[in-house]
Amino acid sequence: MRINPTTSDPAVSTLEEKNLGRIAQIIGPVLDVVFPPGKMPNIYNALVVKGRDTVGQQINVTCEVQQLLGNNRVRAVAMSATDGLTRGMEVIDTGAALSVPVGGATLGRIFNVLGEPVDNLGPVDTRTTSPIHRSAPAFIQLDTKLSIFETGIKVVDLLAPYRRGGKIGLFGGAGVGKTVLIMELINNIAKAHGGVSVFGGVGERTREGNDLYMEMKESGVINEKNIAESKVALVYGQMNEPPGARMRVGLTALTMAEYIRDVNEQDVLLFIDNIFRFVQAGSEVSALLGRMPSAVGYQPTLSTEMGSLQERITSTKEGSITSIQAVYVPADDLTDPAPATTFAHLDATTVLSRGLAAKGIYPAVDPLDSTSTMLQPRIVGEEHYETAQRVKQTLQRYKELQDIIAILGLDELSEEDRLTVARARKIERFLSQPFFVAEVFTGSPGKYVGLTETIRGFQLILSGELDGLPEQAFYLVGNIDEATAKAMNLEGEKK
């Protein structure tokens, strides 16, 4: 971490005198720059092109050095559009990698890949910046203890628990509740863990980024009246950006999260939406730099690029970064190199189901498809593991019986199967719960359910103690006591 001069500071003018180059070639977002002999910039150095285009418009383009070509030439990738640049324009070597603002002042704000605020709320009130390129923490700094990251969301904590400092893949199509789940996690980490979040929008739709910002303001995750009380910082590099920006925006978000972990010593949630677009941007840059493509046209450095990002997301003795990454699977092909490389790094998967969303069961997390490496008796304990397995078995049996029920009806089932179906339907409904961030839409107050309460509730359903209660009593409640109270209210209404 360091205090860096911004490019508008007088301190930069001395750099300008020292190391100036000139543009020799422009191919789309790729620039070749010639420097004086012996003054070649390092790989990953930031270069700044300032000047005016042919119609007198001000130009300020930042690039990142990717290759040293020989003959005093470097090849750099632009982080913004190169419209208006011409050969012969002056290029300033800043002498350092891209650096972005970090710390509490970033909360509630939206940044681009360069760490510049893009929300029209004025400059960021911090002089502390951090370079986006750094190595992963050393082994000696890592916290290797396996511990569960409690989210307060029943279906996640019971069936596919998150690891503190782990990486989770979030799979789901449009309109099944990905955004609401992300916002609830941001809200819960702030309330239960005193932590904050960083959201990296990598190569997704600008409209979705805008919608997310508006929803965060509406639900209180971003506090408009007192911006410092916000729980999240947003970093956007959307679909319309050049590939250089999309390739680096994930690192910008990660750098902000690392500062909160290492300096503020807090737990951080890092959301990356979408990790596939990070790979896709790397593939575009690789082709522009003239590298030979690898399998399915991807960059030959795919595993290295993915590893350099993912290995920085970890728990240290100071704090943890727990990352939730939306994963787009091209043509639903899980063997595609991009998702296949991502899977190697994931500790858990949360799969959202359109079928459950259609039934009105929110969060629409599929209890049978979602997985976690943490669901082992030696990590979560015998009681948790046994309860989770019995819940999955009951739901699996219900799934198998659905065809018979659809054709012949419930009456044709055996007594045992009818009991299984009744309990499975109660479990399915009890896996739903009201969210804090959805209060403004639903009118029902949100619920945070601790892990011990969650396990107790499902044990009571499985034991048959609650067989007499109507299944609608289990729908959209917090803990099991609320379900029994709701059942009594329903009984009272009938009378």
Curated annotation (Swiss-Prot):
**Record's subunit section:** F-type ATPases have 2 components, CF(1) - the catalytic core - and CF(0) - the membrane proton channel. CF(1) has five subunits: alpha(3), beta(3), gamma(1), delta(1), epsilon(1). CF(0) has four main subunits: a(1), b(1), b'(1) and c(9-12).
Coiled-coil ranges (or none): none
- Identify this protein by name: ATP synthase subunit beta, chloroplastic
- Function recorded in the entry: Produces ATP from ADP in the presence of a proton gradient across the membrane. The catalytic sites are hosted primarily by the beta subunits.
Q: Which GO terms describe its cellular component?
A: chloroplast thylakoid membrane; mitochondrion; proton-transporting ATP synthase complex
* Catalytic reaction list: ATP + H2O + 4 H(+)(in) = ADP + phosphate + 5 H(+)(out)
Chain's gene name: atpB
Task: Spell out the subcellular localization from the entry.
Answer: Plastid, Chloroplast thylakoid membrane
List residues traversing the bilayer.
none
This protein's species is Eucomis bicolor (King's flower)
